[in-house]
Amino acid sequence: MFLAETELITGGVSMYPTLETIRQLAQTKEYRRIPLCRELYADRYTPVEVMRILRKASRHCYLLESASQTEVWGRYSFLGYEPSMEITCTDRTLKIRTTDAEGKTEETVRQVTHPGDTLREIIRKYKTPVMEKMPPFTGGLVGYFSYDYIKYSEPKLKLEDREQQDFRDMDLMLFDQVIVFDHFRQKVLLITGVRADDLEASYEEAVKKLEEMAQLIRNGEHMEFEPLRLQSEIQPKFPKEKYAEMVEKAKHYIREGDIFQVVLSNPMRAKATGSLFDTYRVLRASNPSPYMFYFSSDDIELAGASPETLAKLENGTLSTFPLAGTRPRGKTREEDKELEEGLLKDEKELAEHNMLVDLGRNDIGKISKIGTVKVEKYLCVERFSHVMHLGSTVTGIIRDDKDAVDAVDAILPAGTLSGAPKFRACQIIEELEQSKRGIYGGAIGYLDFAGNLDTCIAIRLVYKKNGEICIRSGAGIVADSVPEKEFQECCNKARAVVQAIEQAQEGLE
């Protein structure tokens, strides 16, 4: 890790690292890009306000935030706009759209066996050092991998080309500029990259870019988001009776020994107009979660608050955090405690959780050094606004020949969204659900230019596409599952998002 000394340039502007430090890093020939950061005081701004400005400036933008289970706000909020590249892949057709400084776009299309090779090339091209004073994300690829991305890591798994509103298997945008709220230091950090191959000229360009970003935040026009309006009732695709039939079929496969557990989901849809941004505002206030996100792009708008990490790779340590076993929150502290005790004694929930911890160990073990896979935390009750879950932590040290793309391949989709054994569970999901899952059960987050990864499981979210919103939730089916209870579990998991939509419709101050 490199020390990012601060230097003051014209007007007392705080900027780091120094030009001399950047020169030294460039001379190592190890890095292609060195992050440059400028600080502003944050007391005049909020992430929501800045997001309004960025959305007015660019249709392609994002906001990533976090809060712990104790509802303590996370240290950083990350925002980005005007990506210089978008990489999408659908049924092995890879598209790369680049945008230059003048706004001119160019698109290339090619067929690929696996999009991961292209992602590795891009990350190598922008290889960036980890800087001591910098936040964990200073630029990289931000977006989603859909549930159906599994077709690239498991080519023998046959997924039908069914409707799911033409969802892409992968949609990642390259952001060289990042705006970071450091809530602990009460600073806004503006970050862009300096190219090592043209250092002096690139440094001057970066300083100018940071000034443009500062002016945009200070003086930019705010987006007036159109309020969300439902044009029809939110309805589940599978009514209780149909979902019960699916559960019984899944239990048949369990009795036959095909699987131990499978997660069956139920999408809820409605026609809608307007934006999901106010829905995100409600979620971040009413359902603070480790992963809160808002995305806007050409074809989709997305808002959510996920409790569960899919995969996190930081300085060589790979982690996953399976959540399995659910109870609703109690209305009183006493009722909440009773529900917790019942959860910890429920043999069905404990068996399901143990299976998924084992699956997490297996997934991480695929690409970790022998003897490094550990269960760091086991059977802890994690509380959220509407539900509580049993949670564990599994870690491993990634092998030298593996990387962040391999981590996505190894773990996506999570066992908590598929089942065990995973391959056969995915086949049964394909048979019983009769539709592509799209983003549900996939991954949302970033792969950075330093080789790190932080992604959540795509749950507790709503997306809007082609004039329709969709919320999807699932339940883990085991041998003694009661169909009606599993249907209700789907409803419980969707409740926080449905209530956020209803509140957003009523209007926010």
Predicted ranges, named:
Residues 1-14:
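Short, Lys/Arg-enriched N-terminal segments with co-localized hydrophobic residues
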Residues 11-509:
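Extended alpha-helical targeting/anchoring segments
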